[in-house]
């Protein structure tokens, strides 16, 4: 996966091939195919792994929140900050061929990652369990929108927090 991330950083998504990833990792193409099945899956898993690693660092920030809404808001704010700060994640902002954000099936690959990041909500408030799928769906769609369509109205973290809180608060389950 590191070889794939190196290729994305140096050549963009178009530079990622099974052969190039195998060469960079020092393994055979068959090994890469056996582990990932396709170029798209290789890229998606590499980006998802990096996203989980980068966003994993925000749990202390999210754990300091009091409500489900605040947790989701902080996760989205931190996610946008990570995309802005990390060179490989920043490539997600470019509408280039091979970008996994624009691949068919992207949502089905992104939902398990989002679910993993939002699963701590159930531990904090078991009443959230019945709504978790909906929370994953709305948080993922909002996060993608925030990352892809930056705007002056929500450019700063505080502006984004206010916007997200205003619209997410009525939609989130009450904490018990």
Protein language model features and the residues they cover:
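Ser/Thr-centered, proline-biased regulatory motifs
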Residues: 13-20
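Amphipathic alpha-helical segments used for helix-helix packing
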Residues: 78-108
């Amino acid at each position: 996966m590191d070889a794939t991330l190196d290729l994305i950083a140096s050549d963009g998504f178009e530079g990622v091939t099974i052969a190039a990833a195998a060469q960079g990792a020092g393994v055979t193409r068959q090994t890469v195919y056996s582990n990932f099945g396709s170029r798209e899956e290789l890229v998606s898993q590499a980006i998802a792994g990096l996203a989980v690693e980068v966003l994993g660092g925000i749990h202390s920030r999210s754990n300091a929140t009091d409500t489900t809404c605040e947790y989701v808001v902080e996760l989205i704010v931190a996610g946008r900050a990570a995309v802005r700060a990390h060179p490989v994640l920043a490539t997600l902002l470019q509408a280039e061929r091979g970008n996994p954000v624009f691949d068919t099936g992207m949502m089905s690959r992104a939902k398990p990652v989002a679910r993993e990041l939002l699963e701590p909500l159930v531990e904090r408030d078991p009443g959230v369990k019945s709504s978790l799928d909906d929370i994953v769906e709305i948080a993922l769609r909002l996060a993608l929108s925030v990352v892809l369509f930056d705007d002056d109205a929500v450019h700063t973290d505080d502006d984004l927090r206010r916007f997200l809180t205003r619209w997410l608060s009525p939609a989130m389950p009450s904490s018990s």
